[in-house]
Amino acid sequence: MVASQKFSDAEIDSFGEALNDTKKPLKARFRALFILRNIGCDRSVDWIGKCLNDESALLKHELAYCLGQMQNKHAIPTLVSVLEDEKQEPMVRHEAGEALGAIADPSVKDVLRKYAQDPCPEVSETCQIALGRVEWVEKSGKDTNSPYDSVDPTPSASTSDVEELAATLIDASLPLFDRYRAMFSLRNIKTDKSIKALAQGLYCEDSALFRHEVAYVLGQLQSPVATQELKDRLLLSTENCMVRHECAEALGAIANEECTEILKQYVNDEERVVRESCEVALDMAEYENSDDLQYAHV
């Protein structure tokens, strides 16, 4: 793990400068970001925060995601500022709200309550779920760390009955918090049956936020069982770009020949965030098929 190593300020600054260098390919900037995330110190947080005025919504959303995964309270003012900035793209504001939920400091509850009423559904739904997570962590004294080295937006459900979880997942009458809990349980079960059930969430038309989270979780699983469903939503030009981009990255994580060929077809998509996602996903697929032990080299 990178975080176990000691880095000088100068070394951290070199990664930060690489992240903020707009002349570098996006895939190189992503690798610099992941190194800073794994280091996790305040200086890393500051470098990541400095990049949140970039032109790439994809990069900015990943910056906010990483700040949440680091769970460093030093990032809270930066994330609140991004959430409040209506000029930021919805996918970036959403990720800032989710990151505040991941850090789960009680001080963010008021701002999450405020933006749980935001007119943008991706933002309001995110803040409702994030507030639920902060309150759950407060009440239970536990975190929502997953077997996938990530901080989940909600805990997993208490049942392991795949059919029951599948029904909860696609029930639009239930709160998103409960459906997310079913989602993470299906992921953790990790059978072909649970993955197929999970993939059906990509067809739930009631929430783009929900579909994008399903795609993200399928990327964590890296199972070719879900390839067709991910392909369906990437190919759908009317789909929300948040969902299409997450489908692209999930296909990159699966990294087989079929997925790589799909990504190559969309590397020139009209939507910038989809184009860039395919570029990064192809880089990730190349890594998955290489002998490299670590994606973000130091």
Curated annotation (Swiss-Prot):
Protein name (Swiss-Prot/TrEMBL): Deoxyhypusine hydroxylase
Any one GO molecular function term: iron ion binding
SUPFAM superfamilies tied to this protein: ARM repeat
HEAT-like PBS-type repeats, residue ranges: 28-54, 59-85, 92-118, 178-204, 210-236, 243-269
Biased composition (Polar residues): 143-159
Residues holding Fe cation 1: H61, H245, E246
Disordered: annotated span: 140-159
Recorded phenotype for the gene knockout or disruption: Embryonic lethal with the production of multinucleated cells from the one-cell stage of embryogenesis leading to the in utero accumulation of abnormal and enlarged embryos.
Enzyme class, UniProt record, top EC level: oxidoreductase
Annotated function: Catalyzes the hydroxylation of the N(6)-(4-aminobutyl)-L-lysine intermediate produced by deoxyhypusine synthase/DHPS on a critical lysine of the eukaryotic translation initiation factor 5A/eIF-5A. This is the second step of the post-translational modification of that lysine into an unusual amino acid residue named hypusine. Hypusination is unique to mature eIF-5A factor and is essential for its function.
Cofactor: Fe(2+)
EC numbers: 1.14.99.29
Signal sequence annotation: none
Residues bound to Fe cation 2: H94, E95, H212
Gene: dohh-1
